[in-house]
């Protein structure tokens, strides 16, 4: 039996996305909100809403005690964390279970394993899936021996290398080093940044992958020992190490033909080995980085639903949120091993930001909002708008500046591109400054049309006249 009432522990478009599926399944929903989000669409969409604190996320959407109080007050029997905020925090998952509710996501010990990049590397290695060559333990930066070891590893894997904070993400605590003379300084800098941003001073190093592509595999596992790969997503259109456009299937040339299909099969198998190693449960994404030769290396597991999950839904016809709910309720997944993947889907994240000024966030009001030539927040076979705002909303500096996701599907990649471009052409978000025009510039570019782009492409394109 599915849950009677689910508390959605998030905001914006993902909260609305979860609420929509719950409503279709006859599940009552509870929204939480900050003072800044009192009139937000996710609040009005839900059956109940509870104020959990003031605007800053640390005092509201990250306030575990306040959220647990809302859980108790409303009698919800399960918690869906969405993405971001508390979605991958094992302490929160444990607290939900201790409160007598179900956390709709992986087990706390799984969140611990994949929330630590060193542990995740060890899991991948033990599963026979290769991470990017580098150190398998944190570097002892405070000792001469530790620095010497780092230099030896760097010499072995070859320059340039990248120093990373173990607790880092989104490009924070990461620095490229081109020669030995820069290692010691980079180790200290990344360690200091990691400590300040993530309360974790540990660092490690990896080979720097030139012209990298970011490719990920959607996996789904249940409590009955089943694990499935639902295809790959290409996520290489990025700025500041964060995604703007995602698509499925990947248009990378090394995935074409019979050899490409074999490479995909190997990629899916590599992803499944990793999640099976820890007895994974629920939705997850195994992220890989590909070099210009098509060699694929494990990066990490995002132990939650991804922002870009709709592109997988569009090509498979599955509702991943529904699958999350069913798995969390103990149901056995249907056989998804050979689920048909049809056509091509592309998602664009629409942000309140200025691409001409380094993609700097641009908070402000949204007085006029027209989606897709007046079609509204459409949910059709070929087009979806996943929005967290309405006319009269205000993009505040307290949260991520994403306004919405627009997702298009077509029988072919060209058809999907055309559908997405038409949708964006007919979209007005005023007077806000957004990246919508830049997304259309990406869609029109020769590199994107050819599928010949990497993670540096968007920032290069933004500087073109």
Predicted feature locations:
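ATP-binding N-terminal substructure of ATP-dependent carboxylate-amine bond-forming enzymes
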Residues: 1-127, 136-152, 415
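ATP-dependent carboxylate activation and anion-phosphoryl transfer catalytic cores
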Residues: 2, 7-29, 33-35, 49, ...
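Post-transcriptional modification and biogenesis factors for structured RNAs
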Residues: 132
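Short beta-strand/loop motifs in extracellular/secreted proteins, especially
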Residues: 161
């Amino acid at each position: 039996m599915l849950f009677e009432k689910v508390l959605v522990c998030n905001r914006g478009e993902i909260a609305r996305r979860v609420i929509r599926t719950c409503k279709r399944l006859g599940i009552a929903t509870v929204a939480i909100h900050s003072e800044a989000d009192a009139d937000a669409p996710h609040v009005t969409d839900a059956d109940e809403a509870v104020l959990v604190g003031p605007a800053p996320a640390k005092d509201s959407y990250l306030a575990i005690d306040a959220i647990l109080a809302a859980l108790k007050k409303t009698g919800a029997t399960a918690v869906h964390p969405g993405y971001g905020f508390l979605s991958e925090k094992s302490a929160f998952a444990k607290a939900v279970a201790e409160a007598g509710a179900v956390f709709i996501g992986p087990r706390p010990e799984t969140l611990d394993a994949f929330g630590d990049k060193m542990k995740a590397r060890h899991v991948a290695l033990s599963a026979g899936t290769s991470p990017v060559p580098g150190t398998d333990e944190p570097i002892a930066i405070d000792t001469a021996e530790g620095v010497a070891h780092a230099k030896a590893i760097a010499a072995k894997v070859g320059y340039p290398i990248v120093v990373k904070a173990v607790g880092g993400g989104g490009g924070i605590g990461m620095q490229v080093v081109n020669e030995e003379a820069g290692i010691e300084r980079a180790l200290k800098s990344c360690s200091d940044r990691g400590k300040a941003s993530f309360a974790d001073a540990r660092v490690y190093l990896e080979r720097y992958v030139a012209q990298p592509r970011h490719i990920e595999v959607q996996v789904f596992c249940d409590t009955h020992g089943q694990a499935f790969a639902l295809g790959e997503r290409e996520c290489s259109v990025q700025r500041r190490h964060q995604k703007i456009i995602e698509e499925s299937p990947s248009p990378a040339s090394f995935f074409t033909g019979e050899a490409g299909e074999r490479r995909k099969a190997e990629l899916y198998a590599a992803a499944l080995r990793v999640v099976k190693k820890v007895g994974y449960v629920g939705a997850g994404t195994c992220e890989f980085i590909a070099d210009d030769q098509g060699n694929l290396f494990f990066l990490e597991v995002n132990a939650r639903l991804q922002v870009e999950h709709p592109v997988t839904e569009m090509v498979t016809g599955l509702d991943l949120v529904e699958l999350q709910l069913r798995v969390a309720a103990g149901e056995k997944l249907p056989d998804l091993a050979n689920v048909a993947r049809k056509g091509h889907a592309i998602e664009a994240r629409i942000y309140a930001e200025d691409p001409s000024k380094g993609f700097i966030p641009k908070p402000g009001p949204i007085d006029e909002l027209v989606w897709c030539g007046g079609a509204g927040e459409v949910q059709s076979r070929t087009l979806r708008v996943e929005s967290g705002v309405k006319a009269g909303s205000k993009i505040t500096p307290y949260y991520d500046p994403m306004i919405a996701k627009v997702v298009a599907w077509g029988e072919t990649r060209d058809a999907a591109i055309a559908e997405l471009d038409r949708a964006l052409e007919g979209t007005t978000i005023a007077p806000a400054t957004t990246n919508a025009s830049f997304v259309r510039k990406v869609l029109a570019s020769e590199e994107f049309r050819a599928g010949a782009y990497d993670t540096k492409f968007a920032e290069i394109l933004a500087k073109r006249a």
